[in-house]
């Protein structure tokens, strides 16, 4: 497996560069478009890459079926349906049962690639998962701060929420990646080419998913800008990008 790490600050044409890689793989290496995965942190980046690829390379959306976010890929590979995803109504039911107002982190995750729950309890529960920690361990992290009711209240909420999901086969978007990472090696999709965009913003949990995907791939391109890691507070681990082994390439602004 070959691996190339591409550092591209804003204004260096990173997306254009990545699409040239796609074109080269299609034209020169004769890779089928459905064997190319372009995986981004946010919907915006995935949608932009897909739109430009279709326009520039004369293919259809169906051809580039693997231009998507990590959450979207996990959702598809787990063979889930919309009713399996925790909705506002699900959180309302749990909130009413516990007499505690819990927010739905899914909306932010779909837009920004990370969940930003409005209430402190969901922040800790989701934050623990993306960091690969137990809820109790993350609760004691100095960055968490004071929670009214302390660990016992948080444990009560976490247990009730987990039970609700298990009984109804429900998942939030972070759970999708947790479950994907449990898949057996043989059931993880195999790609000829994998492109990871916005890698500086990936959490520990998302990096584990990326590692499983690239194990089954022939050529890997990981792109990002460690200076633009704006989601450290939400669990982003840009050091994984910096320390990744492979051939490094740095893009520069045209002057």
Predicted features and spans:
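P-loop NTPase Walker
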Residues: 1-83
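Short, polar/flexible loop-turn hinges at active-site or ligand-entry regions and domain interfaces
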Residues: 31-35, 56-64, 80-93, 102-109, ...
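Short, well-ordered alpha-helices that flank and scaffold nucleotide-derived cofactor binding pockets
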Residues: 20-28, 51-55, 178-185, 208-215
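Short, surface-exposed alpha-helical segments at coil->helix boundaries
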Residues: 47-50, 174, 238
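Accessory N-terminal region flanking or inserted into the helicase ATPase core
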Residues: 1-8, 16-17, 35, 106-195, ...
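SF2 helicase/translocase NTPase motor core
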Residues: 54, 61-64, 69, 88-97, ...
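Conserved helicase motor core of SF1/SF2 NTP-dependent helicases
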Residues: 9-12, 20, 41-43, 200-255
């Amino acid at each position: 497996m070959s691996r190339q790490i591409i550092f591209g600050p804003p204004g260096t044409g990173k997306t254009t560069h990545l699409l040239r890689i796609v074109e080269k793989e299609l034209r020169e290496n004769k890779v089928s478009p459905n064997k190319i995965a372009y995986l981004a942190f946010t919907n915006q980046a995935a949608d932009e890459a897909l739109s430009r690829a279709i326009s520039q390379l004369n293919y259809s959306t169906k051809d580039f079926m693997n231009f998507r976010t990590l959450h979207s890929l996990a959702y598809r590979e787990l063979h889930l349906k919309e009713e399996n995803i925790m909705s506002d109504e699900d959180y309302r039911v749990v909130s009413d049962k516990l007499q505690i107002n819990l927010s739905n982190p899914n909306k932010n995750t779909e837009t920004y690639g990370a969940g930003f729950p409005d209430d402190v309890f969901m922040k800790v529960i989701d934050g623990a998962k993306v960091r690969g920690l137990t809820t109790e361990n993350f609760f004691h992290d100095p960055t968490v701060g004071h929670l009214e009711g302390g660990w016992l209240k948080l444990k009560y909420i976490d247990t009730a929420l987990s039970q609700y999901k298990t009984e109804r086969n429900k998942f939030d978007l972070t759970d999708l990646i947790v479950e994907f990472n449990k898949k057996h090696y043989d059931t993880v999709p195999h790609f000829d080419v994998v492109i990871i965009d916005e890698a500086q913003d990936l959490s520990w949990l998302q990096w584990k998913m990326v590692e499983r995907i690239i194990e089954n791939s022939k050529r890997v391109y990981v792109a990002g800008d460690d200076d633009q890691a704006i989601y450290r507070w939400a669990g982003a681990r840009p050091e994984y990008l910096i320390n990744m082994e492979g051939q490094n390439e740095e893009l520069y602004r045209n002057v």
